[in-house]
Amino acid sequence: MEQTYQYAWIIPFLPLPVPMLIGLGLLLFPTATKSLRRMWAFQSVLLLSIVMIFSMNLSIQQINSSSVYQYVWSWIINNDFSLEFGYLIDPLTSIMSILITTVGIMVLIYSDNYMSHDHGYLRFFAYMSFFSTSMLGLVTSSNLIQIYIFWELVGMCSYLLIGFWFTRPVAAKACQKAFVTNRVGDFGLLLGILGFYWITGSFEFRDLFQIFNNLISNNEVNFLFVTLCAVLLFAGAIAKSAQFPLHVWLPDAMEGPTPISALIHAATMVAAGIFLVARLMPLFIVIPHIMNLISLIGIITVFFGATLALAQKDIKRGLAYSTMSQLGYMMLALGMGSYRSALFHLITHAYSKALLFLGSGSVIHSMETLVGYCPKKSQNMVLMGGLTKHVPITKNSFLLGTLSLCGIPPLACFWSKDEILNDSWLYSPIFAIIAWSTAGLTAFYMCRIYLLTFEGHLNVHFQNYSGKRNTPLYSISLWGKAGSKISNKNLNFRLVTLLKKKKNGRPSFFSNKVYKMDENVRNMIQPFLSIPNFDNTKTYLYPYESDNTMLFPILILILFTLFVGFLGIPFNQDVDILSKWLTPSINLLHQNSNNSIDWYEFCEDAVFSVSIASFGIYIAFFLYKPVYSSFQNLDLINSFVKMGPKRIFSDKIKNAIYDWSYNRGYIDAFYGTFFTAGVRKLAKFTHFFDRRIIDGIPNGVGFMSFFVAEVIKSVGGGRISSYLFFYFSYVSIFLFIYYFLNL
């Protein structure tokens, strides 16, 4: 066992050769590297699979022995400062490692087909492998300095993948938004790290926790300063895990490819913030005010994310706000001190959300054959519906993921979310009411997404179904670059037909006008496509199921969604695998903790939570099931008959909720009005002050010196007669003034 732990340092570095070799290959042998591009995908999956097997071996040993292993190398040593690098293998590390590798492998396999059309295929796999390396390095770090280094690398990889299609302005802006928002949190994290080093004199977790606890017990610290440093550390987690109010980057991050959305939302970037709080829990738990703040931010995010998801029309944005809300549940659990419940929900949510995102990617992939490669169309649930008979495997997998997130037993998220909901009653009745109510909202909006996507009729064929014409549609090239409008005459092959007149004169979603692609782009993608002849025009009237390469990871994630929840079911102490796994960490936080459970109380709470979820599902079916719904704008309430004043009142409520969700709770508008505009005004004032005041004073002095010098120069001409004239003139003026003053 000791030998296995000694080689654990290699875990973060195993996926690293792939991006390095891809970079060298593209630099030195570009043609050969591109021709063998499938080989790089295989190597990425193979190396990450080795890490997964290694992580599973470590986890099994930890479950059996409840051990924690740390090894460090001294990097800098002197009398005043020492810096060590190493790795820490504990239950939190092993859980995160398995989560990262299993989800990462599924996403890599899925991406091989999903990204096959993209000329950035190799770049994508290089980024993904480096992303895995960064996240694995983060979870194995033994001190705050390593945490910060890999924290920044995780952020960098996220920015690269969010802006993967950087030629699209909206993707570039989303990347910038994620970068700027996370800079706020990262700066706070850095200040917090420096603050706690100033207090304790150590970056190592074990030494830091021990020294800090001794200082707290002896009352040798300034609690105000300690709380400030803890808040700064927590700010990093707020930004990275998209917690209120630094959540604004998360929905815009959907501009990246769908596979990376699955990885970010399941096991990497947003999970990093939860991991950081869990890692620093022994530090936070002795500071009551910071624990209250963590739970407060968590419950606000829970409710806020759920309300923003109510009326989203973009399938990926709806899932993004769902992630935000579920991360709020995890943060709430950590703030309440429910360490086990938070990590349990992190595990179950990761597999369920990965399943949902890969399922949405399959839907988007099938819709692109109808509406073109345009995210605003292929991700728009307004144009979906009726996909059940066209993509049955995707539909069933998405349904399972939806029911899991709704909290329906025996699926994964039911067990973990139910623990958090039960613990919330013990912490705060107000928080409990909000958390339980949001569980109903979660069931509502997730069922809404499912119904709009798969039930009813394929709305892409009924463009004027609601009585309103859609805005003009535009083409997006395969690489995400904005294409030309329909009127562009320089296009040269048919991609999809739109707005075609039927025989009865009614407009449908198809037309005789065509989209075409530039010749150079066609030449780039031809070798990578499975279509034998790209010149042959083939228009699909209906979506079709994805290839087996994309379906295989979805089917594996279905198994995880069905069975991973049984890891944490507390039947008894011997069967509760998760509690045995987390024994060292739980004992560190709660000495002599008792994991026994009252099954009668558990079943009573479970019936209540399932009833709330079922009520949310029923409301969604009532409003969005095709037999009732008129699909008028696909808003929240769209099926009530006219009822006079009551209908007017319900319309006001509907419009208010829709505006709240569509405008993202007005947080983005608030930031744009006050922060962005304020920074610009401050910049203009600073520019004016710098140019007119700071530069104006020395420039004015220089100008006056020049003017005086010119006057003196004109006076001093070198003629004695001039000197005598000025001399007698000044004497005369002086005598004249003196005479009049003495009168």
Curated annotation (Swiss-Prot):
Main location: plastid
Coiled-coil segments on the chain, per record: none
Enzyme class, first EC level, given as a word: translocase
GO molecular function: NADH dehydrogenase (ubiquinone) activity; quinone binding
Domain of life per record: Eukaryota
Assembly behavior: NDH is composed of at least 16 different subunits, 5 of which are encoded in the nucleus.
UniProt similarity note: Belongs to the complex I subunit 5 family.
Protein name per Swiss-Prot or TrEMBL: NAD(P)H-quinone oxidoreductase subunit 5, chloroplastic
Organism whose genome encodes this protein: Ambrosia trifida
